């Protein structure tokens, strides 16, 4: 007999797969029927036309319940799907600015930045310098400080402005809501 695979270990044992001499039985209505022999529990399950499912194999004696195993698996998969649906993937959006970004463009980008943060995404702000603009990095810092001030109510600075080559980078993440 080969060792059970991971898939077999994940599934609960049912009916004849339960080999222990006695089990703690929970009936169809969810009431405790006490500790009974496995044969008796199987007979009770067959009389009700349902399966005997081992719920807690590590308990002494193991806890078994009379239920429809197919329905049990379906409910379990529904719960897992619901849990997966509730998980939110956090994306990192990127907005690019220049030290010469005009006010109209700044307002449009700020609106997009706030929208991204409200959706729960992080935003990486890249401020790129070209040519002789590198001599005036204070203009870039002013833009980043202005962005930080304008988004103070919805964002937290996750990574403060730092220089990488010809760019300044800053990462904002949404404020935690209670």
UniProtKB/Swiss-Prot annotation:
Q: Pfam families, alphabetically?
A: IF3_C, IF3_N
Entry's localization field: Cytoplasm
Keyword Protease in record: no
**Which branch of life, at top level?**
Bacteria
Give UniProt keywords alphabetically: Cytoplasm, Initiation factor, Protein biosynthesis
Subunit notes for this chain? Monomer.
Homology family: Belongs to the IF-3 family.
Name it: Translation initiation factor IF-3
Q: Source gene? A: infC
